[in-house]
């Protein structure tokens, strides 16, 4: 089975941006989210990962714009950012996206998250945003600025709730082009039977090949952001490298 690549479109104030380590204020602008998403579709993407960073940081939202973008795309969309209650979840799903990615809600409101998983099943993925603190993997919430508790305890709880897939980000790697945390991915795969989507740190085609080497352990896909925008490689090159 080949690795699914999900090019990322992160949106701030109506513009496609990339952050460094998820820090507000570290944005580099890349123009229209619509143009970015359509470009990835034209380059052969089967999925696009779209993040409303304003909603993630709790400073507004780009919901109407993103609904328009999802509506224009023919490919599947994973929608993320600020989905923390019934209203934001239903609005996200109403865009017609393939699935949504819950982050902070899984940490701060486990009962609600469990209900969402029970109701929507495969439409719900949970983002596990991780940072190594004193030798232990800890989760981060609210745009990665709040403490979220122990990774393994949360993963066990979400597995029990029936979570269908996890998007695993090493926050220290994201937007840095320093390579993915393969050890973290392997450990998460060993701890759950649910498929895992990797995120953060991809800088070269070889990084993607290394992640593809974990497909037989449970890694299903990889989100790719800054490396594509920075021109390290093209999406067609990446897709060719990890197909089959």
From Swiss-Prot:
<dbReference type="InterPro" id="IPR044524">
    <property type="entry name" value="Isoase_HisA-like"/>
</dbReference>
<dbReference type="InterPro" id="IPR010188">
    <property type="entry name" value="HisA/PriA_Actinobacteria"/>
</dbReference>
<feature type="active site" description="Proton acceptor">
    <location>
        <position position="10"/>
    </location>
</feature>
<protein>
    <recommendedName>
        <fullName>1-(5-phosphoribosyl)-5-[(5-phosphoribosylamino)methylideneamino] imidazole-4-carboxamide isomerase</fullName>
        <ecNumber>5.3.1.16</ecNumber>
    </recommendedName>
</protein>
<dbReference type="InterPro" id="IPR011060">
    <property type="entry name" value="RibuloseP-bd_barrel"/>
</dbReference>
<dbReference type="GO" id="GO:0004640">
    <property type="term" value="F:phosphoribosylanthranilate isomerase activity"/>
</dbReference>
<keyword id="KW-0413">Isomerase</keyword>
<dbReference type="InterPro" id="IPR013785">
    <property type="entry name" value="Aldolase_TIM"/>
</dbReference>
<keyword id="KW-0028">Amino-acid biosynthesis</keyword>
<dbReference type="InterPro" id="IPR023016">
    <property type="entry name" value="Isoase_HisA-like_bact"/>
</dbReference>
<keyword id="KW-0368">Histidine biosynthesis</keyword>
<feature type="active site" description="Proton donor">
    <location>
        <position position="129"/>
    </location>
</feature>
<comment type="pathway">
    <text>Amino-acid biosynthesis; L-histidine biosynthesis; L-histidine from 5-phospho-alpha-D-ribose 1-diphosphate: step 4/9.</text>
</comment>
<dbReference type="GO" id="GO:0000162">
    <property type="term" value="P:L-tryptophan biosynthetic process"/>
</dbReference>
<dbReference type="GO" id="GO:0003949">
    <property type="term" value="F:1-(5-phosphoribosyl)-5-[(5-phosphoribosylamino)methylideneamino]imidazole-4-carboxamide isomerase activity"/>
</dbReference>
<dbReference type="GO" id="GO:0005737">
    <property type="term" value="C:cytoplasm"/>
</dbReference>
<dbReference type="InterPro" id="IPR006062">
    <property type="entry name" value="His_biosynth"/>
</dbReference>
<dbReference type="Pfam" id="PF00977">
    <property type="entry name" value="His_biosynth"/>
</dbReference>
<comment type="similarity">
    <text>Belongs to the HisA/HisF family.</text>
</comment>
<dbReference type="GO" id="GO:0000105">
    <property type="term" value="P:L-histidine biosynthetic process"/>
</dbReference>
<keyword id="KW-0963">Cytoplasm</keyword>
């Amino acid at each position: 089975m080949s690795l699914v690549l999900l090019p990322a479109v992160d949106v701030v104030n109506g513009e496609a941006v990339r952050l460094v380590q998820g820090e507000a204020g570290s944005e580099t602008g890349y123009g229209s989210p619509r143009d970015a998403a359509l470009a990835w579709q034209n380059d052969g993407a089967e999925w696009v990962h779209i993040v409303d960073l304003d909603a993630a940081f709790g400073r507004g939202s780009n919901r109407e714009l993103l609904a328009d973008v999802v509506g224009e795309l023919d490919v599947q969309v994973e929608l993320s950012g600020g989905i923390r209650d019934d209203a934001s979840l239903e609005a996200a799903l109403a865009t017609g996206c393939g699935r949504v990615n819950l982050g902070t809600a899984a940490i701060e409101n486990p009962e609600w998250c469990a209900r969402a998983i029970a109701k929507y099943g495969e439409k719900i993925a949970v983002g596990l945003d991780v940072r190594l603190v004193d030798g232990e993997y800890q989760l981060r919430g609210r745009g990665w600025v709040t403490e979220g508790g122990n990774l393994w305890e949360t993963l066990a709880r979400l597995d029990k709730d029936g979570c269908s897939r996890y998007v695993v980000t090493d926050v220290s790697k994201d937007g840095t082009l320093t390579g993915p945390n393969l050890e973290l991915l392997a450990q998460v795969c060993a701890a759950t039977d649910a498929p895992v989507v990797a995120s953060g740190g991809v800088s070269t085609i070889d990084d993607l090949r290394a992640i593809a080497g974990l497909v037989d352990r449970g890694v299903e896909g990889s989100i790719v952001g800054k490396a594509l925008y920075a021109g390290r490689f093209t999406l067609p090159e990446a897709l060719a490298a990890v197909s089959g």
